[in-house]
Amino acid sequence: MNKPLLTTTTFGLFLVLVAFALAYQFVKPAPPKQVTMATGGESGGYHAFGVAMQASLADQGIELTLIPTQGSVENAALLEGAEVDLALIQGGTHTQGEHLRGLASLYFEPLWIFKRVEVSRNVTRLRELKGLRVSIGAPGSGTRALAEELLTLNDLSFDVFLPLNTKESTQALLAGELDVAFVVGGATSPDISELLHADGIELVSLERAPAYHLQHRYLSPLLLPAGAIDLATERPAEDKALLGVTAMLVATDDVHPALVDLLLLLSLIHI
C-alpha cells in the first residue's frame, strides 16, 4: 500500500472511531467500563497487541486489564472458565466452550524452527530432529500445542524434547545449550527478531509444508523469500518454506455488542 493511500485509510478509520466513540456513550444498556484480556508472555506479540488495545480503550473510558499467560492454550482455558472476557488464541487451539465467540482473525503467525549452524545435520523434515536438543515451547503455550501436533503427525514422541518458553529457548539457543528451538509469533517479536538476526543461527525450511496443510486446514504454508528479513545481509540467504497459523481475537458470548464493534474497529488500527 502506498503512503498516501495508507494515510487516507488511517485518517478514515480515525474519523469512524471518533464518531463511534460519541455514539458509544449513549448505548443502552451501557457497555462495561472494565474488561479483561488474556494475552501471553510479556515479550510476545499477543501482549504487545494487548498493550496497544489497552491504550486505545483507555481513550474511550474503558479499562482493559491484561492477564499475561504462557500462551494460547492457557488463554483458551481462562476464556472457557469465564475468568476473562477476551483472549488472543492461536488457530488450531482446541476449545470446548460453546459460549465462545470468534471476533476477528488478526494476522498470520509463522512457526519458526531455528537451528544452530554448527549442527551439521541438514534438517528439512521433523523426523530429522531425532537425537538433537530441541525446545518445543512451554506447557500452555500455542507453540507447544502446535509442536506436539506436528510431532505426532511424524510419529515422534514429544516427551524427549524440552519445555522451554520463548525467552528461555532464545537464550539457550544463543548460548549453545540447544540445537533447535520451535517458536510461534511475529517477526517483530523481540526474541524472534533477535534469532532472525543472530550469527550462527539459521531457519529450518520445511520441504513438506504443503502436506501439513492437507492434514490440518488451519495450517497454512508460507514462503519467506530470500532477503526478506534483511536485504543488506541477505537474511535468509535462500527462500524458506514455513508453516503459519492465524492469531484470533475471541470473546465470551455475553460481551456487549457495542464493545464488540469497538474492538473490531480498534483491531483494524492495531494489526
Where do the protein language model's features map onto the residues?
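Acidic, polar ligand-binding/catalytic clefts
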Residues: 70-121, 126, 186-191
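A structural signal for short loop-to-beta-strand junctions that line the ligand-binding cleft
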Residues: 98-106, 134, 232-240
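Pocket-lining segment of extracytoplasmic ligand-binding domains
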Residues: 158-244, 255
